[in-house]
């Protein structure tokens, strides 16, 4: 794999890279987000390898936490944002994430989406058990992209423009126990105060799905690529860097 040299990093970035307990993001000279041991990224899935009969998708975050696809007739790769992406057929294809994504004080989900169609309530992400839950999908009333975070401490809805059919759009979502945010193409669309924490959602989690729902809702239909999950809320500048590109843990030196 191509190696990305980290020349030109600031002293602060180098301290974060070498492991001083910091979770500050590190960026490359061209502004891309670099996954390090301290970045908080627990999974990064590029779909650069063929999906075999095991339905395993390799992790490029350095944590070696694979995820698994679900299509009964075999998962398919399609043209992605970079190289290949995973094709979600809208019928039985989705990804199950590892529970470690809820281990931190915050949470980040980011991915490139190229929808083939949208159905009301179709899911990009759904984590929880319906009572304590975080989901992202198409809203019925506004026809916008909506993130709901709900639990015993209250519930909030955050909105963003719905990614257009047939076009690549970068989506990022964060929560940190104080605020929930949605980003489209590296820019914040809305932020809403939120008291629910990942630990609240993960206490009795039922499903941790990319492309499927904990309710009987439609599945995502289209292609996703470069799915990144972190157990902290990345900052706005870090999300902007992720939008520019990600240097995988196994690509940096």
Can you annotate each of these PLM segments?
Residues 1-4:
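Positively charged n-region of N-terminal signal peptides that target proteins for export
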Residues 6-12:
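Sec-dependent N-terminal signal peptides
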Residues 21-64, 77-253:
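Extracellular glycan-associated modules
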Residues 16-19:
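C-terminal motif of bacterial Sec signal peptides marking the signal peptidase cleavage site
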